[in-house]
Regions:
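N-terminal intrinsically disordered, cationic/polar leader segments
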Residues: 2-146
Length: 146
């Protein structure tokens, strides 16, 4: 599994084993940064992100909804992009939109340029899903189906 990010960082993520799946936890000072960390954690569950510059910029967005719905929408969108376009996102830039949605872009590189460290997740589960304000910031917890 990917390297853990220190818990005491202002923003970060970690992966925890869970039978045949993985639990992704992410945190940040605000919702957009927590979502960005969750996206990065999902990528790092299957790929070692290169330090090279991104070759393309793709849009990513989630419509207004509850925090958990926005999280799942973004994670599923990321998995779709990886599967359909054979690219791997390496950085995310998200901002809040009116009504509670999120929009931004992701810097991507061709999938052939990353080191595969695990299987690409199949999806995201609603089981045990949580996201919300906590400890002066935002935290999320999501089960990843690998």
């Amino acid at each position: 599994m990917a390297q853990l990010t220190p818990e005491d960082a202002g923003a970060g993520w970690r992966l925890l084993p869970h039978t045949a799946d993985a639990i992704l936890e992410a945190w940040g000072p605000d919702r957009a940064s927590c979502l960005s960390q969750a996206l990065l954690g999902l990528v790092r569950s299957f790929a070692e992100v290169p330090d090279t510059a991104a070759t393309q910029l793709l849009p990513i967005a989630a419509p207004p909804g509850g925090p958990e719905d926005v999280l799942v929408s973004l994670l599923e969108d990321l998995l779709y992009v990886v599967d359909v376009f054979a690219v791997v996102p390496v950085r995310f830039h998200l901002t809040e939109t009116e009504g509670g949605g999120v929009a931004g872009d992701m810097e991507v590189v061709p999938a052939a340029e990353v080191e595969v460290v695990g299987p690409v997740p199949k999806g995201v589960s609603y089981h045990g899903l949580s996201m919300g304000p906590r400890d002066g910031g935002w935290r999320c917890h999501v089960l990843i189906d690998v």
